[in-house]
Curated annotation (Swiss-Prot):
Keywords: Cell adhesion, Cell membrane, Membrane, Phosphoprotein, Postsynaptic cell membrane, Synapse, Transmembrane, Transmembrane helix
Listed InterPro entries: Neuroligin/BSAL
Organism: Macaca mulatta (Rhesus macaque)
Record topology, Extracellular segments: 1-73
Topology within the bilayer: Single-pass type I membrane protein
Cytoplasmic topological segments: 95-213
GO process terms (BP): cell adhesion
Gene assigned in the entry: NLGN4X
Protein name: Neuroligin-4, X-linked
Region called Disordered, residue ranges: 1-56
Keyword Cell membrane: yes
Length: 213
C-alpha cells in the first residue's frame, strides 16, 4: 500500500472544521494522514469475490434475458399461428360436411321423379311386350287355322294320276306279276276302285302304257 503523509497547519482550538484532526493535548498536536482511493484492480477482495458483479456484467445479463424473451415470443407466435391454421382447416372440413348433408337432404325429390320415370318406362316396355305377344299369338292361330284347312281338304287324286312319267318309277316284270296278288289283298282298302280283281293288269292306269286303240 502506498501511504502519503501530509502536514497541515494547526487550527485554533475553537474551530472544528477538520473532524479528522485529533488533539490530545493543547501543547502537542499530531499531524493527520489521508489514504488514497483504492482502485478496483488493486482490491484483492473484489478479485476474490466472484458473486459480486460490476455494471458491465449486469448489462450482459440483461441482454441475454432479452434474447431469450425474443425467442420465446417468436415460438409462441409460431405456435399460435399453427393453431389458428388448424382451427381454420377443421372449420373448412366441417363446413363441407354440413354442405353435403344439406345437399343429400335436398336430393330425394329428384330421385322420386327418376323412380317415377323408370316405372313409367317399365310399364311402356311391358305394354309393348304384351302387344308383340298378342300379335305373335294371332299369327300362330292364323297359321294353325290354315294348316287345319289344308288337312281337312281331300287329296286330289287326279293330280297324282296326271303326274309326269318321270315321277313314277318304272315297274320291273317281277313287280308286274305280283300286282294281281297285291290287288286282291288291297281291294277292301280302295273302295273307290271299280275294277274287279280278275281283270288284266293292263287296265291299270300307268304312265307309259303301250296299248293302242
Amino acid at each position: 500500500f502506498q501511504y502519503v503523509s501530509t502536514t497541515t497547519k494547526v487550527p485554533p482550538p475553537d474551530m472544528t472544521s477538520f473532524p479528522y484532526g485529533t488533539r490530545r493535548s493543547p501543547a502537542k498536536i499530531w499531524p493527520t494522514t489521508k489514504r488514497p482511493a483504492i482502485t478496483p484492480a488493486n482490491n484483492p477482495k473484489h478479485s476474490k469475490d466472484p458473486h459480486k458483479t460490476g455494471p458491465e456484467d449486469t448489462t450482459v445479463l440483461i441482454e441475454t434475458k432479452r434474447d431469450y424473451s425474443t425467442e420465446l415470443s417468436v415460438t409462441i407466435a409460431v405456435g399460435a399461428s399453427l393453431l389458428f391454421l388448424n382451427i381454420l382447416a377443421f372449420a373448412a372440413l366441417y363446413y363441407k360436411k354440413d354442405k353435403r348433408r344439406h345437399e343429400t337432404h335436398r336430393r330425394p325429390s329428384p330421385q322420386r321423379n327418376t323412380t317415377n320415370d323408370i316405372a313409367h318406362i317399365q310399364n311402356e316396355e311391358i305394354m309393348s311386350l304384351q302387344m308383340k305377344q298378342l300379335e305373335h299369338d294371332h299369327e300362330c292361330e292364323s297359321l294353325q287355322a290354315h294348316d287345319t284347312l289344308r288337312l281337312t281338304c281331300p287329296p286330289d287324286y287326279t293330280l297324282t294320276l296326271r303326274r309326269s312319267p318321270d315321277d313314277i318309277p318304272l315297274m320291273t316284270p317281277n313287280t308286274i306279276t305280283m300286282i294281281p296278288n297285291t290287288l286282291t289283298g288291297m281291294q277292301p282298302l280302295h273302295t273307290f276302285n271299280t275294277f274287279s280283281g280278275g281283270q288284266n293288269s293292263t287296265n291299270l292306269p300307268h304312265g307309259h302304257s303301250t296299248t293302242r286303240v
